[in-house]
Amino acid sequence: YGFNKPEWQQYLIYIGGMLHGDFGTSFQYSNQPVSSLIGARLGASMQLGLQALILGVVLGVIVGAIAAVKQGTWVDSTATVISIIGKSVPNFVLAVLLQYYIGLKLGLFPLAGWGQFSQTIMPTIALAVGPFAETARFIRTSMVDTLSSDYIELGKAKGLSRMEVIRKHAMRNSMIPLVTLIGPYAVALMTGSMVIEN
């Protein structure tokens, strides 16, 4: 372990090992390599992260688009409040609430375990709330800006229906900047899923 060397050398040895995939050995799990322990659990984290990313982004796009189209109505206000609450509540708090009410009180889904799809539903929902809230707010803002653009007015002047203008022009152009958010979402979900999994 190099404990007899100066601290700066120990640090450099450790960082050098990490660059080569050697994270050391676990003291808790009978001296097993840490990299093998991470590898054994990475599949579950990736599955939860991917499910949460898909669910959060898809629902966020739908809710954000509806809020933008219904701008200034109770639908817009409700979507905004839900997005703010979704961003404000930590996912581990939501996970505990889901376990208590949906898992324990209602008995709809298993409280713990791994191996069946039903066991991933509550953790996926808990993880998806953050990306959902951000995506809904982002899409709403982007679509409101897009709907007030000149080319939207031109589409209406050409005789396109409101739904055609929204689908062909507003949605398409509002989705492009969303791609920049997916990378940070994926990283946040991979790190956040560790808390939810426990």
Task: State what each model feature region is.
Residues 22, 89, 105-106, 146, ...:
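A general structural signal marking secondary-structure boundaries and capping sites
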Residues 14-16, 81-110, 126-130:
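Membrane-water interface segments at the C-terminal ends of transmembrane alpha-helices
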Residues 1-12, 27-28, 32, 103-122:
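Hydrophobic alpha-helical transmembrane segments of membrane transport/permease proteins
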Residues 20, 94-95, 144:
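Alpha-helical transmembrane segments and their lipid-water interface positions
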Residues 3-61:
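An internal, D/E-rich "acidic patch" concept
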Residues 1-6, 57, 66, 74-86:
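N-terminal signal-anchor/first transmembrane alpha helix
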Residues 2-3, 16, 20, 103, ...:
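Residues at helix-coil transition
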Residues 38-75, 91, 114-198:
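Alpha-helical transmembrane segments of integral membrane proteins
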